[in-house]
Structures are given as C-alpha cells and as structure tokens.
C-alpha cells in the first residue's frame, strides 16, 4: 500500500511491479492496476495511399479496410468557402495541391513531427502526445496520416499546418476514419 501511495506522487508513466504479476502504473487519471502479460508486438500496420487510389478518389470515394475500421478517401474541388470545412473529429480536409509525396496511414515511428504553423515550425509527435495527455500505452495504437516523417493528421486529434486548407486551395483531399472503437460511423 505504501508503494502505491508513493507511486501516486510520482510522474505519469512510472510503473511498479507488485506480487502475483500485477503492475501499477501512474496515469493521468490516477493509478492503473493490470496483470503483466507477455509483450505483444504492437501491430505496425501501414497502408500506402497510392497514386492509383488518389486517381480513383477524384471520381469516387475510395474505401480501404483497416484492422480496426475503414479509411475513406475522396478528392474534390474546393469552392473557397472556409465555412464548408467539416468540424468532425474523424473527418479532415487537406489541401491536395500541397501534398508533395506519398501518403501513408500508419502508426507512430521514431522522428515523427507535426508542422504547427504556416511558418513551418515543428513539434515532435511525442511532445504532442505528452501535451495532450495521451497515455503512453495508447500512443502506439493511434493512426497517423503521414508523408515521410511529417504527420499531416493525428487521427482523432489535430492536423498539421503543412497541408491545411486555405482560401487559395483548389482541390481538397477528404480523409475519414470509420468503424473503429474510437471513431463513429455517424459523426455529428
């Protein structure tokens, strides 16, 4: 009990081992108790969004199967009306003209970063996760839309400034996640 009380005063992420294979971890909400299980390799799925897929997305919605849901892609003309941009958690618009290289939907990797403003300033993805108080145990499960190491979108969170839609945007790439535990098919 004393160890748990001490753990509560420590920084988030600290873990202590208790008898019978039980672990206690300091999390933002308090202390989480769980049984130690063999380390499971976190799925490192990665889905490349090919040029062929993007060509099809100009004509129709392209739907890709994910282990925990679906990825929907669509490219269309943008009217310039900034009020049209959806305010949904799992639907985001990107300036298609600013996307320079291949897109990939993947989990986090070393060296990932977000552009945080139009001036090109960056923030490490890890720093973003810490600032948003996303538990370390959940970070490997979050989908990211990336071009190289630049993160365009942290699914369920912010988009990077590098491909944000602006008044000069001509075409938009609409990306939507659906069907997973955290994303809803029908967003409000």
Predicted regions and their residues:
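AMP-forming adenylation/ATP pyrophosphatase catalytic core
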Residues: 1-188
């Amino acid at each position: 009990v004393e160890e748990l009380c001490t753990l509560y005063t420590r920084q988030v992420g600290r873990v202590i081992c208790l008898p019978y294979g039980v672990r206690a971890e300091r999390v933002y909400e308090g202390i989480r108790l769980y049984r130690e299980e063999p380390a499971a390799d976190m799925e490192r799925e990665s889905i490349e969004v090919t040029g062929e897929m993007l060509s099809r997305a100009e004509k129709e919605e392209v739907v890709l199967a994910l282990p925990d849901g679906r990825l929907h892609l669509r490219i269309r003309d943008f009217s310039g009306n900034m009020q049209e941009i959806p305010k949904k958690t799992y639907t985001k618009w990107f300036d298609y003209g600013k996307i320079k290289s291949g897109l990939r939907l993947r989990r986090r990797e070393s060296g990932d970063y977000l552009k945080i403003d139009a001036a090109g300033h960056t923030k490490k993805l890890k720093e973003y996760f810490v600032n948003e108080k996303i538990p370390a145990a959940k970070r490997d499960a979050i989908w990211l839309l990336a071009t190289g190491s630049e993160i365009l979108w942290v699914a369920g969170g912010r988009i990077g400034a590098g491909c944000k839609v602006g008044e000069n945007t001509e075409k938009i790439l609409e990306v939507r996640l659906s069907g997973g535990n955290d994303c809803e098919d029908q967003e409000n």
